[in-house]
Swiss-Prot record:
This is 4-diphosphocytidyl-2-C-methyl-D-erythritol kinase. Keywords: ATP-binding, Isoprene biosynthesis, Kinase, Nucleotide-binding, Transferase. One of its GO terms (biological process) is isopentenyl diphosphate biosynthetic process, methylerythritol 4-phosphate pathway. It holds the Pfam family GHMP_kinases_C. Catalyzes the phosphorylation of the position 2 hydroxy group of 4-diphosphocytidyl-2C-methyl-D-erythritol. Its EC number is 2.7.1.148. The keyword Transferase applies. The gene is ispE. ATP binds at P96, M97, G98, G99, G100, I101, G102, G103, G104, S105, S106. It comes from Pseudomonas fluorescens (strain SBW25).
């Protein structure tokens, strides 16, 4: 009997650096960024149904079901594969929305990979990543599941192998609008491209940080507090702020001091996502 239910992780990501090279004619920005995963994230549970209905059973405040990337991913995969089956989906949500750690994109990728497995479609990662790109620029890296240097709008991926420290991640209670940051006139848009691999350690700058810190005092405060213990960085356009530590004990110690006033968590960096490790264990 085939497996009809499946629970999969939906990991967070960090942008270890983010350089903006310029704006394209279509309005998108040319980027260079380095993605790494965290062993921390949401959890999605899927149950196959035979009537073709796609049903997300978890409510998201302010997000209509049909606008949710989970539902969009499921419907696109169903349509493009001509699959007659449907799916029930539940999510245990812990990743913040608008945090810059890839919550929605990761959920979409977990949905594509989970349904590909449950519906027995046999799609490879290239095909799933191409579909994922139509949902968002960050979806392909979650589909492929390996730390990567990304170019273009974030979709041209080259595997990378950065160190895997323990991270303290702070979550300022504010949702940052990516569109707002990328339209800010003071945003740096002319960083010279990095042409050396692996990415040199000195290139850890995030071009969005000055704009986000100026617009959002909550983010600026988190950067200042974490910066007392380690180099504090912004992931994506925020709002989440992170810093690396060589051991869990050190990360836990700093986190305990900071989370008295700020929300945050400790997680291990990983160059292979916990989603892909789980899928490999099912083979």
């Amino acid at each position: 009997m085939s497996v009809q239910t499946l629970t999969l992780p939906s990991p967070a990501k960090l942008n270890l650096m983010l350089h903006i090279l310029g704006r394209r004619e279509d309005g998108y920005h040319e980027l260079q960024t380095l993605f790494q995963f965290l062993d921390y994230g949401d959890e999605l549970t899927f149950a196959v149904r035979d009537d073709g209905v796609i049903q997300l059973h978890t409510e998201f405040e302010g997000v209509p079901h049909d606008s949710n990337l989970i539902v969009k991913a499921a419907k696109k995969l169903q349509a493009q594969s001509s699959c007659p089956l449907g799916i029930d989906i539940w999510i245990d949500k812990i990743l913040p929305m608008g945090g810059g750690i890839g919550g929605g994109s990761s959920n979409a990728a977990t949905t594509l990979l989970g349904l590909n497995h449950l519906w027995r479609l046999g799609w490879d990662d290239d095909r799933l990543a191409a579909l994922g790109l139509t949902l968002g620029a960050d979806v392909p890296v979650f589909v492929r599941g390996h730390a990567a240097f990304a170019e273009g709008v974030g979709e041209k991926l080259t595997p990378e192998y950065p160190e895997e420290p323990w991270y303290v991640v702070l979550v300022p209670q504010v949702s940052v609008s990516t569109a707002e940051i990328f339209s800010d006139p003071l945003l740096t848009r002319n960083s010279p491209p990095i042409k050396v691999r692996p990415v040199p350690k000195g290139n850890s700058r995030n071009d969005c940080l000055p704009v986000v810190a100026r617009r959002y005092p909550e983010v600026r405060n988190a950067l200042n507090l974490l910066g007392k213990f380690t180099e504090a960085k912004l992931t994506g356009t925020g709002s989440c702020v992170f810093g690396g530590f060589p051991s869990k004990a050190e990360a836990d110690k700093v986190s305990a001091l900071l989370t008295e006033t700020l929300t945050g968590f400790v997680a291990k960096g990983s160059n292979v996502s916990m989603l892909h490790r789980k899928l490999q264990s099912l083979l």
